[in-house]
């Protein structure tokens, strides 16, 4: 669920996700096209691809269960949709954390009209 994803990102990065990531680069937030602008934007590209692979459910609105153990996200539960969705969100949140040093404020509200490179496939 998007609200759970928000909490994961906040825990992993310390940043407010809606401000910091909702409009970042060419892939963070709604939609996506062109080539990812940097490593953070690539996290969003990979997250979008991960969601595309989740079939038979709507990953954006599926609730899942997770916990934090020693600073690590642990996805819990059994149903396919929720477990896979949680893993997609977990990977993205960790990716954001791992790329904090290269986060660029200039991409924070990047207009998608500048995302003109050919779109990469998953």
Curated annotation (Swiss-Prot):
- Here the disulfide bonds are 26-115, 28-44, 43-95, 49-122, 50-88, 57-81, 75-86
This protein's cofactor list reads:
Ca(2+)
**Enzyme class label:** hydrolase
Where in or outside the cell it occurs: the entry states:
Secreted
Q: Show the catalytic activity.
A: a 1,2-diacyl-sn-glycero-3-phosphocholine + H2O = a 1-acyl-sn-glycero-3-phosphocholine + a fatty acid + H(+)
Kindly state the tissue distribution recorded for this protein. Expressed by the venom gland.
Assigned EC number: 3.1.1.4
Q: Which family does it belong to?
A: Belongs to the phospholipase A2 family. Group II subfamily. D49 sub-subfamily.
Q: Which positions in this protein are listed as binding Ca(2+)?
A: 27, 29, 31, 48
Signal peptide range: none
A GO biological process held by the record: lipid catabolic process
Question: Which GO CC terms are listed, alphabetically?
Answer: extracellular region
Please name the CDD domains in this protein's record: PLA2c
Q: What does this protein do?
A: Snake venom phospholipase A2 (PLA2) that displays edema-inducing activities. PLA-A is three times less active than PLA-B in edema-inducing activity. PLA2 catalyzes the calcium-dependent hydrolysis of the 2-acyl groups in 3-sn-phosphoglycerides.
Q: In the UniProt entry, which residues are flagged as the active site?
A: 47, 89
Entry's SMART domains? PA2c
Cofactor binding note: Binds 1 Ca(2+) ion.
What's a Pfam family this protein contains? Phospholip_A2_1
Task: State the name under which the record lists this protein.
Answer: Basic phospholipase A2 PLA-A
| Key words of the record | Calcium, Disulfide bond, Hydrolase, Lipid degradation, Lipid metabolism, Metal-binding, Secreted, Toxin
Please list the GO terms describing molecular function.
Answer: calcium ion binding; calcium-dependent phospholipase A2 activity; phospholipid binding; toxin activity
């Amino acid at each position: 669920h998007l609200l759970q994803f928000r909490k994961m990102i906040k825990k992993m990065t310390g940043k407010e996700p809606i401000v910091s990531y909702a409009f970042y680069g060419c892939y963070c937030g709604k939609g996506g096209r062109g080539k990812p602008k940097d490593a953070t934007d690539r996290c969003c590209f990979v997250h979008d691809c991960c969601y595309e692979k989740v079939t038979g459910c709507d990953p954006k609105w599926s609730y899942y269960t997770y916990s934090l153990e020693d600073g690590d996200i642990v996805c819990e539960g059994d149903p396919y949709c929720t477990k896979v969705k949680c893993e997609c969100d977990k990977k993205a949140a960790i990716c954001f954390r791992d790329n904090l040093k290269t986060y660029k404020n200039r991409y924070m509200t990047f207009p998608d009209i500048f995302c003109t490179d050919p779109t990469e496939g998953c």
